[in-house]
Amino acid sequence: MVSPRKGKRIRMLKKNDIIQVAISDLSHEGAGVAKHDGFVFFVDNALPEEVIDMRVLKVNKNSGFGKVEAYHYLSPARNADVNLTYLRTGIADLGHLTYEDQLTFKKKQVQDSLYKIAGISDVTVESTIGMTEPLAYRNKAQVPVRRVNGQLETGFFRKHSHDLIPISDYYIQDKEIDRLINFTRDLLRRFDIKPYDETEQTGLLRNIVVRRGHYSGEMMLVLVTTRPKVFRVDQVIEKIVEAFPAVVSIIQNINDKNTNAIFGKDFKTLYGKDTITDSMLGNNYAISAQSFYQVNTVMAEKLYQTAIAFSDLSKDDIVIDAYSGIGTIGLSFAKTVKAVYGVEVIEAAVRDAQHNAALNGITNAYFVADTAEHAMATWAKDGIKPSVILVDPPRKGLTESFIQASVAMGPQKITYVSCNPATMARDIKRYQELGYKLAKVQPVDLFPQTHHVECVVLLIKE
């Protein structure tokens, strides 16, 4: 719909007004975009080409939010089979879009960010690498526990709230993880365990966290409680392990703070090991409750394989792995290069990376706890000259000081693994100003059914 002609009197929209609109696009977060009388509205569960009756939820200066009251025309790209609960909680905020169209949407997000932020339109963005089976892929679940209708429930919070929606089938989580969560929920109900109450700051059980090795099948169960004393723990452990022999680790975490953080500082192993083990690209990894480990093992392997292919490595190459975590990317590179130098600010992750290198008999990978900027300056003084710098930053992207420090080392290539197209495009623009040219762009779908997209890009020194 077009903006009104100059001078035309406009009735200002207010909350709960219902208007008919056409959806013209999707936002970068997967919401439908509708334009009406100069306003842009964002509408959940609405797709391009759809015509809807929209209830106004909120109006800002030039934009607003609405929700679907009725559909007049449905997009042929709509997946009609998805449970709306997954949209309401954000578990699968793109689940109403067919998977083929999800992949197209994610490619477009990368293209749009590169053009709008970095002014780049002359580099091909490849089609998004997708999953053959894009459901039940998550190897980790973090599930809040609350009282709903008088009983302990597990599920997810409604979007933009702390109202728990009970769920038994989490759609994108490994089905064995779902089974363990539901079994634990039912078991703790029988023991009359009190769920956490955020408002009153009472109750014992806050969260259930489960990890499962994609290849090993090993499972870890973490019970997050508000105090150290636990409930008939021997009986609970016995019943869980009897029903799930693959559970090799049961851990208690104590979080007594009024916070949205999942974990507190204190962990206690109640049963079995402190870690589970899984493999990725032929390397084995010890994974603790807190370890950062990609939640989609199959697609993480494709992501890392893409980064390795883009880097075009040889036995004479030296690679710097910034943001090295527990070593998963760097150790994947180590087999094909002279040496890998990894840096990570979290000391526990560095210890895990060192342990994982030893676990796999890898002797040419070195990990330090430091800021990347300081570590790179130290390595430069020691005469280390990387041919490739690999970066895998958090969503906020790279700092100016990091970019300057990486350029100062003079690598021929920078391989950038991104989880945020906008900050990636910003950083690419800066690298191009400093003498690097964007050569390759490959989106990878690590998070099917959601709006999130990972991307691997290659920058080459001009």
Swiss-Prot record:
InterPro entries per the record? MeTrfase_TrmA_AS (IPR030390), MeTrfase_TrmA_CS (IPR030391), NA-bd_OB-fold (IPR012340), SAM-dependent_MTases_sf (IPR029063), TRAM_dom (IPR002792), U5_MeTrfase_fam (IPR010280)
UniProt GO BP? rRNA base methylation
Q: Where is the TRAM domain?
A: 12-70
Q: Molecular function terms in GO for this entry?
A: rRNA (uridine-C5-)-methyltransferase activity
Record-listed E.C. numbers: 2.1.1.-
Which sites bind S-adenosyl-L-methionine?
A: Q294, Y323, E344, D392
The active-site annotation reads C419 (nucleophile)
| UniProt keyword Transferase present | yes
UniProt entry keywords in alphabetical sequence? Methyltransferase, S-adenosyl-L-methionine, Transferase
Report the sequence similarity comment from the record.
Belongs to the class I-like SAM-binding methyltransferase superfamily. RNA M5U methyltransferase family.
What name does the UniProt record give this protein?
Answer: Uncharacterized RNA methyltransferase SpyM3_1024
